[in-house]
Amino acid sequence: MKVQFYEEDGHTLAVFGGEWADTNKTQVLCFCIEEGHVGATPDYLATLKRATKYKAQQLFEQLKNDYYYTDLIAEY
């Protein structure tokens, strides 16, 4: 699975799957984890910065143990 990490306005977002190049056709999942909030958001966050792969892997390990998000992430 492709996992990318971004930061915007003090929030950390992880993007699972998809490609940023074609924002009209590709829907990706963004997870905001700074405040324990996890949710889906559109894929037009073009100004976000890439963060470390290590941090992205940490989030994936955390989410894959959650029953609900295991099914959600498995689609990607």
Residue ranges, per PLM feature:
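A short beta-strand micro-motif
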Residues: 2-10
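Short intrinsically disordered terminal tails
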Residues: 1-2, 71-76
